[in-house]
Amino acid sequence: MLLAIEGIDGAGKGTLCGELLALAEAAGVRAAALSFPRYEETRFSELVGAYLRGDMGAIDQVPVRYAALLFGGDRFESRGKLMTLIADHD
C-alpha cells in the first residue's frame, strides 16, 4: 500500500506519519516513510533547495511550471527508492 500525506509546512505531516508508522509497527505491518523533497539526495532536490532559498530569484518571480518541474523531477529521480520500499513493505 502507498499512502501519501500532503500539507503545508507545520501542518503536522511528520507527526501524523510518525503515529501511523507506530500503529503499523504495533500491528505487525512492515511500513516505511519517504519525505519529499529529498534534500541533497537527488539532483532535482538540490535545485528545489536552491529555489526555496531564493537562489533562482524571488519565489514569486520563478515560473510556477518550472518550480513544479523541479518538485516532480525529485520524485522521478526517487522512483527506484520508492519502488524498493513498496516491494519490501506491506
Predicted regions and their residues:
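Hydrophobic alpha-helical packing residues
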Residues: 20, 24-25
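P-loop (Walker A) phosphate-binding loop of NTP-binding proteins
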Residues: 8
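ATP-dependent small-molecule kinase phosphotransfer cores
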Residues: 29-90
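Residue-level signal for beta-strand positions within conserved beta-sheet cores that form or flank
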Residues: 1, 27-30
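Hydrophobic anchor at the beta1->P-loop junction of P-loop NTPases
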Residues: 3-5
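Walker A/P-loop
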Residues: 14
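ATP-binding Walker
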Residues: 11
